[in-house]
């Protein structure tokens, strides 16, 4: 069965070199994580699978890698300067700060109910409770104290301030002079780089509607309370598509991308029945969204949380960044833009008249994807002899190590030389990482590779080099299957094809 607690995953990730705390030798830095030898392989494999499915295997997609630091005008006209914020409260007693919705949600049910009652909303509609607290800050401070909202740090009822917005973008100075005219932002999402490069991509590729632009890259959000391992972090990586289509076809494309993304998650080992589709209520939609589907995965300990959002952003984004807005018939409500120097239109495929396209955006976080893949693959099994093993039943294309080549005797040159030659041959096939494993104890090596998700272990033994009891086994190796524990003798000359057929 999959992992049932976050602690199991955290322990495995630290022990086996998937994920480490950022800046750990100096006490760590909250909200920042480093990916170790196996973590970087798994992360890269997830990204490669996404890129292959959405760029290489489609005829309507282009790729992009935009800059991380953005001109502040980009994020002003996108709405981020004004709206990219979370409500924050302080406890005057402990001097700790918390994101309001997280603080209330984590209280005991009776306390949450008292907060809802105090602010005049139903406890069944938590979003409305938070919205009311934000809308009435003075009353909110009184309600939090009266309801007995406790500080997670001290465990005592806090002396809470009025909620106030906290903008989550990281500012940075650009150039040698640090003043108000020289600052920019670390991008809070990868999407804006796609929108600002829309005309460049269209002009350089001669694309016509419908088509998309895909990007994988880092984004930065100064979360008030980062938590839950790599689920909510301050430095994250996104896999985003902005799919441009003719107004009026957007709803059909929205459904298309919902199905396409569900199919991709299933191919990563997360069945459709493990994902809930949340049609986000109108009152909870982002300022740019006409309709959004949130794909919700049942994370251990956390419960159902968003793993991907698929939004119909209408013509808001290109309409916000284009010049000559008044003459383009933009349907979304956008702020006036007298700063842009580009007209972000494309010929309508039927009328050939300039049109500002609608946008469908599938947006997934690499870190959350990795956490879900690990949680779903994590399995505890009781073997016939009563012992327990932990195995990561990762899809082969995601496994950090594809094959481990193990010499049965690491001090016998005739065996190790064959094992090293096999490793070199398999590595040259382009399957992914192949590991030469000479730790000594074959049983422990098998268990270790079960735990990190290696699909196959290839053992070179005395029979392989013609020093066993059965001459027929010369030039063969034992291949062990991670999931079935089955073992099969395969001729060295056939090994590459045997593995390629199972790992592709």
Curated annotation (Swiss-Prot):
Reply yes or no: does the keyword Cytoplasm apply: yes
* CDD domains per record: GlyRS-like_core, GlyRS_anticodon
Q: Write one Gene Ontology MF term.
A: ATP binding
Binding locations of substrate: 99, 189, 236-240, 361-365
Q: Where does the record say this protein resides?
A: Cytoplasm
Q: Which GO terms describe its cellular component?
A: cytoplasm
Assigned EC number: 6.1.1.14
Q: Where does ATP bind?
A: 221-223, 231-236, 306-307, 365-368
Taken from the UniProt record, the cysteine pairs bridged by disulfide bonds within this chain are: none
* Broad EC category: ligase
Keyword annotations from UniProtKB, A to Z: Aminoacyl-tRNA synthetase, ATP-binding, Cytoplasm, Ligase, Nucleotide-binding, Protein biosynthesis
Any GO BP annotation: glycyl-tRNA aminoacylation
User: Chief location of this protein?
Assistant: cytoplasm
Task: List, alphabetically, the InterPro entries matched.
Answer: aa-tRNA-synt_IIb (IPR002314), aa-tRNA-synth_II (IPR006195), aa-tRNA-synth_II/BPL/LPL (IPR045864), Anticodon-bd (IPR004154), Anticodon-bd_dom_sf (IPR036621), Gly-tRNA_synthase/POLG2 (IPR027031), Gly_tRNA_ligase_bac (IPR022961), GlyRS-like_core (IPR033731)
Reactions it catalyzes: tRNA(Gly) + glycine + ATP = glycyl-tRNA(Gly) + AMP + diphosphate
NCBIfam families the UniProt entry points to: glyS_dimeric, PRK04173.1
Concerning its family, UniProt says: Belongs to the class-II aminoacyl-tRNA synthetase family.
Oligomer and partners: Homodimer.
Q: What does this protein do?
A: Catalyzes the attachment of glycine to tRNA(Gly).
List the HAMAP family hit by this protein, alphabetically. Gly_tRNA_synth_B
State the name under which the record lists this protein.
Answer: Glycine--tRNA ligase
Say which species the protein is native to.
Deinococcus geothermalis (strain DSM 11300 / CIP 105573 / AG-3a)
